[in-house]
Amino acid sequence: MNRFLVLLMSLVLALPVQALDLQGLYEQALTASRQGDFVEALPLWDRFLEQAPEDAAALSNRGNVRLALGDPSGAIDDQSASIVLAPEESDPHLNRGTAEEALQDWSAAADDYLWILERDPQDASALYNLANVRGSQGDWPEARTLARL
């Protein structure tokens, strides 16, 4: 019985430490990302997501890092997974659109930016990025109109 209590207490006491470690790992990954140290950030995000695979923000952040490291397809995968987990968040749509632009998938990028603009017609980032897409598609009048909004 004493062994059982000791085991139970060790598990109960370990939970807050584990949560603190996970939060610390998130902060380390975020700091490395913000400092532009993407080579360091990617394995930190990987480790965090092994323990918290349902964290939409972490998936989106890892997607940004993957794009910065030249992996637009991986970035799209992460942003898409983030969208599944948090369908009303606009950041993963914006980030996925940027990755789609890197692959010159103008139609998919435009769809992501338009999704944002349907919800917030004045979103400056979505307007700017959609203007870039329209310019890349050769629709300069539309690009100029969007850039003025």
Where are these regions (language model features)?
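Helix-start (N-cap) detector for alpha-helical repeat units in TPR-like alpha-solenoids
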Residues: 21-22, 56-57, 90-91, 124-125
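Register position in tetratricopeptide repeats
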Residues: 34-35, 68, 102, 136
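Conserved structural position within tetratricopeptide repeats
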Residues: 47-50, 77, 81-84, 115-118
